[in-house]
C-alpha cells in the first residue's frame, strides 16, 4: 500500500541525573565530592533511505521513544549516554511540526539526517559544585527532559518529470512505453491510484525519472476525487508533461480539459503554473483524432503541442528528446540560484524557547503560581532531594527577582508557591 502522509509522536530520552556522592577511602581523610554526571538521553533522528518508496512503516506504529541516559555514579563515574533512535523514511519526505505547521526540513538525499527530538543533557554531579567554602556540597543537577514533538510526515515523489491530466488520457501507457515501469493499465477512469515511477534512458545516454500521477478532475485542488493528496507530488518535478486525449469518442472538449487542469494546478499553488510544461496530445492512433487535434491546436494559439501515440510509438522519441532538453535546462537554472526548499542539515537544532521573563499569578487566597521558561527549566534541573540543592534554588530565585515579585503580588510568609511541579512555602 502506498502511504504518502502520516502523523507520528517522537519522545527523546531524558538526561541522566547527576549524583551526590563522596569519597570514603583509607588515607584520604578529607574525602570530597565524587558524584559523576548523568548521561545524555537518546535523540530521535529521521534518515532518508533510497530503498524506501512509501511511509507504510508508520501506518501502524506512530509513537517512538528513545531511552533515558544513565544516572551519574559514585567515584566520579559518568552515566552512559543512551543510543539514538534512527527512523528510516523515503527520500522526498518533508517533515513538519504538526502543531505549528513549520517545515523542519526536507530529506531529499540518500543518508541525509534530521534530528527531530533532541535527548536531554545529563545533569552535573556534585564534583562540579565544590568551592573553597563549600567543600562537601550535597548539590547535583537533574537531567534535562527529552524533547517531545508531534510531526507530520509528507512524502513528495522525487521525479524529474510528472505526467498530469484527466483520467484515461494515456499517462500510464506512456510511462510503460518509455520506461520499464509496469503500471496498472485499463480502459476505465482512476486505474492509477498511486504514483508510479520509472527511469527514461535515451539512445544518446541522457536519462531522467518520470512519475505517472493519478488522474485529476475539476475541483482536485479542493479535494475532489483523488485530488489534493496527489497534487503535492507535482511540486518536486522539474517538468510537467500535460497529457490531453484526442479521442473523438470521449465526448470531451480537449481545450476545456487543458484549461481545467491548469486551473487546478494554480488552485493548489501558483508555483505549479510556473514550471516548464510540455503539452502532449495523446491517443493520435484513434480514427478521428486528427480533426480533434487540429481544433485543439487552433485554440491553443502559439503554444507548442506534441502529438503522440503510445500504441504506435509515433512522436514518442521526439517528445522524450524535448523533455530531456527541458530537464537539463531547469537543472541548470536551479544550479545557478539558491535552493528554494529548506533542506535539512546533518543536524537540525531546535530553537530553545525564548526567555520571556516570568509571570506571577494568584490562584487562591494563599497560593501563587509562577510561570516562565527559564524558571521552569531551573526547577526541573535542580535536585531537590538534598537541603543544599533547595537552598541553592532559593538563592537563584531571589537573584532572579521572584521573591520581590511575589511580595508585590501580596504573598506573605506561609503562602504556597508553585513553579513547574515543585511547590514550596514562601518565606518573607
From Swiss-Prot:
The keyword Flavoprotein does not apply. Mg(2+) binds at residues 172, 192. Its EC number is 3.6.5.-. Residues 1-158 form the Obg domain. Residues 159-328 form the OBG-type G domain. Monomer. An essential GTPase which binds GTP, GDP and possibly (p)ppGpp with moderate affinity, with high nucleotide exchange rates and a fairly low GTP hydrolysis rate. Plays a role in control of the cell cycle, stress response, ribosome biogenesis and in those bacteria that undergo differentiation, in morphogenesis control. This is GTPase Obg. It comes from Lactobacillus johnsonii (strain CNCM I-12250 / La1 / NCC 533). The lineage of its organism: Bacteria, Bacillati, Bacillota, Bacilli, Lactobacillales. The gene is obg.
Amino acid at each position: 500500500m502506498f502511504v504518502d502522509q502520516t502523523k507520528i509522536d517522537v519522545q527523546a530520552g531524558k538526561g541522566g541525573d547527576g549524583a551526590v556522592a563522596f569519597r570514603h577511602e583509607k588515607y584520604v581523610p578529607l574525602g570530597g565530592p565524587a558524584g559523576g554526571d548523568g548521561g545524555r538521553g537518546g535523540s530521535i533522528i529521521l534518515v532518508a533511505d533510497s530503498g524506501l518508496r512509501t511511509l507504510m512503516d508508520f501506518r501502524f506504529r506512530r509513537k517512538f521513544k528513545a531511552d533515558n541516559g544513565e544516572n551519574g555514579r559514585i567515584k566520579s563515574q559518568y552515566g552512559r549516554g543512551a543510543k539514538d533512535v534512527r527512523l528510516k523514511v523515503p527520500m522526498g519526505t518533508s517533515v513538519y511540526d504538526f502543531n505549528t505547521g513549520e517545515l523542519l526540513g526536507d530529506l531529499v538525499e540518500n543518508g541525509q539526517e534530521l534530528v527531530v527530538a533532541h535527548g536531554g543533557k545529563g545533569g552535573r554531579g556534585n564534583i562540579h559544585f565544590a568551592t573553597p567554602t563549600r567543600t562537601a556540597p550535597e548539590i547535583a543537577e537533574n537531567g534535562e527532559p527529552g524533547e517531545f514533538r508531534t510531526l507530520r510526515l509528507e512524502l513528495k515523489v522525487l521525479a524529474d518529470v510528472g505526467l498530469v491530466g484527466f483520467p484515461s488520457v494515456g499517462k500510464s501507457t506512456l510511462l510503460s512505453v518509455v520506461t520499464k515501469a509496469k503500471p496498472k493499465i485499463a480502459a476505465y477512469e482512476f486505474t492509477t491510484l498511486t504514483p508510479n515511477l520509472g527511469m527514461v534512458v535515451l539512445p544518446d545516454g541522457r536519462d531522467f525519472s518520470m512519475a505517472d500521477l493519478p488522474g485529476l478532475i475539476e475541483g482536485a485542488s479542493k479535494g475532489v476525487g483523488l485530488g489534493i493528496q496527489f497534487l503535492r507530488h507535482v511540486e518536486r518535478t522539474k517538468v510537467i508533461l500535460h497529457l490531453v486525449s484526442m479521442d473523438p469518442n470521449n465526448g470531451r472538449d480537449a481545450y476545456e480539459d487543458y484549461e481545467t487542469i491548469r486551473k487546478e494546478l494554480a488552485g493548489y499553488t501558483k508555483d505549479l503554473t510556473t514550471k516548464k510544461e510540455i503539452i502532449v496530445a495523446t491517443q493520435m492512433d484513434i480514427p478521428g483524432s486528427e480533426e480533434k487535434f487540429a481544433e485543439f491546436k487552433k485554440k491553443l494559439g502559439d503554444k507548442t503541442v506534441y502529438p503522440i501515440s503510445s500504441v504506435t510509438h509515433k512522436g514518442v522519441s521526439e517528445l522524450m528528446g524535448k523533455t530531456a532538453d527541458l530537464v537539463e535546462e531547469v537543472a541548470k537554472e536551479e544550479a545557478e540560484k539558491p535552493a528554494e526548499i529548506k533542506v535539512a542539515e546533518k543536524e537540525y537544532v531546535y530553537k530553545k524557547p525564548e526567555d520571556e521573563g516570568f509571570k506571577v499569578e494568584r490562584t487562591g487566597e494563599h497560593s501563587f503560581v509562577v510561570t516562565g521558561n527559564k524558571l521552569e527549566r531551573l526547577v526541573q534541573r535542580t535536585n531537590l532531594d538534598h537541603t543544599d540543592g533547595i537552598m541553592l534554588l532559593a538563592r537563584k530565585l531571589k537573584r532572579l527577582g521572584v521573591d520581590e515579585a511575589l511580595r508585590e503580588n501580596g504573598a506573605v510568609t506561609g503562602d504556597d508557591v508553585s513553579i513547574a511541579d515543585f511547590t514550596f512555602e514562601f518565606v518573607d
